From Swiss-Prot:
Plays a key role in chromosome recombination and chromosome structure development during meiosis. Required at early steps in meiotic recombination that leads to non-crossovers pathways. Also needed for efficient completion of homologous synapsis by influencing crossover distribution along the chromosomes affecting both crossovers and non-crossovers pathways. Also required for development of higher-order chromosome structures and is needed for synaptonemal-complex formation. In males, required for efficient synapsis of the sex chromosomes and for sex body formation. ATP binds at G179, P180, P181, G182, T183, G184, K185, T186. This is Pachytene checkpoint protein 2 homolog. GO terms for cellular component: male germ cell nucleus. The gene is Trip13. One of its GO terms (molecular function) is ATP binding. Keywords: Acetylation, ATP-binding, Differentiation, Meiosis, Nucleotide-binding, Oogenesis, Spermatogenesis. Specifically interacts with the ligand binding domain of the thyroid receptor (TR). This interaction does not require the presence of thyroid hormone for its interaction. Interacts with proteasome subunit PSMA8; to participate in meiosis progression during spermatogenesis. Disruption phenotype: Mice develop normally without obvious somatic defects but males and females are sterile due to meiotic disruption in meiocytes. Homozygous mutants display small gonads and females have few or no follicles, due to oocyte elimination between pachynema and dictyate. Mutant testes display reduced populated tubules and spermatogenesis is mainly arrested at spermatocyte stages of epithelial stage IV, corresponding to pachynema. Different phenotypes are observed in the different knockout experiments tested. The modification N-acetylmethionine is found at M1. Widely expressed, including in testis. One of its GO terms (biological process) is synaptonemal complex assembly.
Amino acid sequence: MDEAVGDLKQALPCVAESPAVHVEVLQRSGSTAKKEDIKSSVYRLLNRHNIVFGDYVWTEFDDPFLSRNVQSVSIVDTELKAKDPQPIDLSACTIALHIFQLNEEGPSSENLDEETENIIAASHWVLPAAEFHGLWDSLVYDVEVKSHLLDYVMTTVLFSDKNVDSNLITWNRVVLLHGPPGTGKTSLCKALAQKLTIRLSSRYRYGQLIEINSHSLFSKWFSESGKLVTKMFQKIQDLIDDKEALVFVLIDEVESLTAARNACRAGAEPSDAIRVVNAVLTQIDQIKRHSNVVILTTSNITEKIDVAFVDRADIKQYIGPPSAAAIFKIYLSCLEELMKCQIIYPRQQLLTLRELEMIGFIENNVSKLSLLLSEISRKSEGLSGRVLRKLPFLAHALYIQAPSVTIEGFLQALSLAVDKQFEEKKKLSAYV
């Protein structure tokens, strides 16, 4: 019996013994080197560094070929599911190498002309875009939001590849992120599109991101005719028809759908308003049938999301304000950047929250500054991620105004900036 069990264990694949480690290789914009040559050089680099600790980035290389052609080699996303960085034995892992170059052209506008009106219907990026480089890493969440979203899209690709019967098992390729303003929902959608374009670069040559302008889409101009909506989605269909492209359609503030429906029911808008909303839902139903499209949507007002749209979403993820632990990570990344740029000088080592926990939050010369940052993080709870990323700038502008500052001085300024932010918030709410 034991022998049979042993044979069975050998026959079954053991995923845990050979985890996949994703390595992103940013090729220089002017480089014309072949991907196979870059791949060989990167493998040699990785073979020389068998053990790494969590995510790791190389920007300087002994190999002249890599120096000429590669801007960075990054071991990424190892910390998405693990609470803390873990040592990784690269020799025991399956390496997934993703080589890419950034598109530096910036967004273009998709215009729709209606008589004399020139309506900007959407913004369009070719991915991976220089504008979104580093955005994924800057977003910090308390739950495994990023890993769940990555796994979701990878599963849609797998099910499509295996020709799973969608009549038996349904999936719509629609993601809905909802929560209060300033929590990074739109940024996460853009970062996800960028990340997946890189992750699937061996399958799709490039990505396309279309951000639909909801405010224009549901204005009186668009409400006059569903034909314009059809025309806009036809442009999107043209992009989807290129099977070398992975297409992301981003609809921000999707609660506008509900606003248009309710206005029509109340008699405040012409009947065309309901037709334009139905046209959008119909077009979404048509494009989601294609295997190379993902529809990303956001909403600031959870209770007002149209039920017809909610039913279409495979994932409905709430994105709330960051906790003190997430705020600590956000501030820590800001301080690291300011030390790198020598605005905070001299550089000093800060402990992570996990390291503070391991020493029982005891104050000493090593932990003093990190404990102060932890205290500032706790009193910052209630502020949005958008505000938190602005606070280091405001701290410098309001309380420092010098080319460089010590970390002690900066933390004092940051604490004052947090206090001021809450004071202003209180004053504003008094007038609402």
